[in-house]
């Protein structure tokens, strides 16, 4: 739909039935928008996404993002946030967080609700998290440089093969 869109604001839209509507964008602000199909935001740089809804079929929606801020999202899809760098996620609900946040680095997480989150954070590094509530097994498997505070992780085998993990008040 908007391939290689730059320096733009997208507001109150619905992207449905069609792959990669905002692929390879730069300096985008996306607000109050619904995504109903897969791969909506791949290979974006300097991306801000706020008050958006990622429906069940928008799986694999946020991959290869460099420098992104994501706030107040409602995410029903699986396999979000892979191979991302320099991302901030806050005040967000992941209803099906399985296989999310894989191979990411330089990640800040604040006030997240993460359900059905098996293998959340796999092989990711340089993560700081605060006020996370995560339900799912094997979270942060093979992760590195992870600092979490004031969080609840209902998980078995969390941090398997992880290195340099610090948990405070968890």
PLM feature segments, named:
Residues 1-170:
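Long, distal/terminal scaffolding or interaction modules
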